[in-house]
Amino acid sequence: MTPSALKKTVLLLGTAFAAASVHASGYHFGTQSVNAQSTANAAAAEAADASTIFYNPAGLTKLDSSQISVNANIVLPSIHYEADSATDFTGLPVQGSKSGKITKTTVAPHIYGAYKVNDNLTVGLGVYVPFGSATEYEKDSVLRHNINKLGLTSIAVEPVAAWKLNDRHSFGAGIIAQHTSAELRKYADWGIKSKAEILTAKPPKPNGVAEAAKIQADGHADVKGSDWGFGYQLAWMWDINDRARVGVNYRSKVSHTLKGDAEWAADGAAAKAMWSTMLAANGYTANEKARVKIVTPESLSVHGMYKVSDKADLFGDVTWTRHSRFDKAELVFEKEKTVVKGKSDRTTITPNWRNTYKVGFGGSYQISEPLQLRAGIAFDKSPVRNADYRMNSLPDGNRIWFSAGMKYHIGKNHVVDAAYTHIHINDTSYRTAKASGNDVDSKGASSARFKNHADIIGLQYTYKFK
């Protein structure tokens, strides 16, 4: 793989795929409120606290006071892989580790504030994590020539306003300013040319395969990039009667152009010896600029709440997400690069994602005046069609959420929420063919199987200004 190949694939796949998290399908982080998490995110129509800013900002008109809500989610993802096969561009087996865990525990904070201007108008501000992911393989993994390390964090800042038209109807709107930063590592096999010369020698060398297999000349690049993008949110909430409420929330797409630089390193003596020769022969610079455009998708949520009694409430939510926006991605470089079949300044991938839906149901029961118990279940559809479109850094699959939690009032001003979620994720598999030669990527074919699940622990504190 040429230096351009590595850098190009790194930035493209890192930024395009990093937005996925093990505990939410596609790009989404999964939960932005512990109060919502306790019902598997089914309680958007409840509008229990200032975190309604994310799920339905029209719900701000339902709050009984100005307040601030601070949330923390501890995410314990578990992705274990087992490689079935991995060959380089010449067809020789890749040497290295064939199994392991590629995730670590992460913490995501969210904070919301609401201010009641008057009985009809409430304004608020949310700072939350809408998208995030982190996976890392062993540096000697046989899948290292695909993606070795992946990390992305998006932080959104959203001012909102909610207006109560009358006792039944409320409307809300927000402007989303989203900052996304990405980090990725990918390895390249710089010994491909030497291997190919040995394997295609005329007459054939008696021990050609064994000789070629001994050539280990990997290099790698670490890439970081960031960008601001902007979107909006629109919401409506309708109290049908004293027991039933429905809501609709729309979150727009957010477009990003992430730009980055690769920091190169040669691994081992053989790769270091090839470094200057490869750069000179192919006309590459060590820190060339590159860009890739990605779009985080819009979503539409319809949700409801029904008061069964003075103590019991039921919740439901259906969310549709336009993941099909991510059907193609291109990374464009400043200069054309020499590739196997000519020249190219870009790499194109076609993940061909499909639109998805998530369905959730939940409920709450008031045990005593200060204590409420909550629970929920949800089905979350994956946008990945099959193993041929799945990335090794994104082993996404259909998932089921099982959530439970509690809410405890301490006097008139303090509220504490706690929640636990276990996410069952279908076992998945991954297949990729070797690079076509039309771009600068020279990875070989590989396949792997994944066993995935996740657990989330949430803690939330709300202070009401009364």
From Swiss-Prot:
One of its GO terms (molecular function) is long-chain fatty acid transporting porin activity. It is a multi-pass membrane protein. This is Putative outer membrane protein NMB0088. Present in outer membrane vesicle formulations which are used as vaccines in human. InterPro entries: OMPP1/FadL/TodX. The keyword Zinc does not apply. It is found in: Cell outer membrane. Belongs to the OmpP1/FadL family. Residues 1-24 form the signal peptide. Pfam families: Toluene_X (PF03349). The keyword Plastid does not apply. PANTHER family: OUTER MEMBRANE PROTEIN NMB0088-RELATED. Keywords: Cell outer membrane, Membrane, Signal, Transmembrane, Transmembrane beta strand. GO terms for cellular component: cell outer membrane.
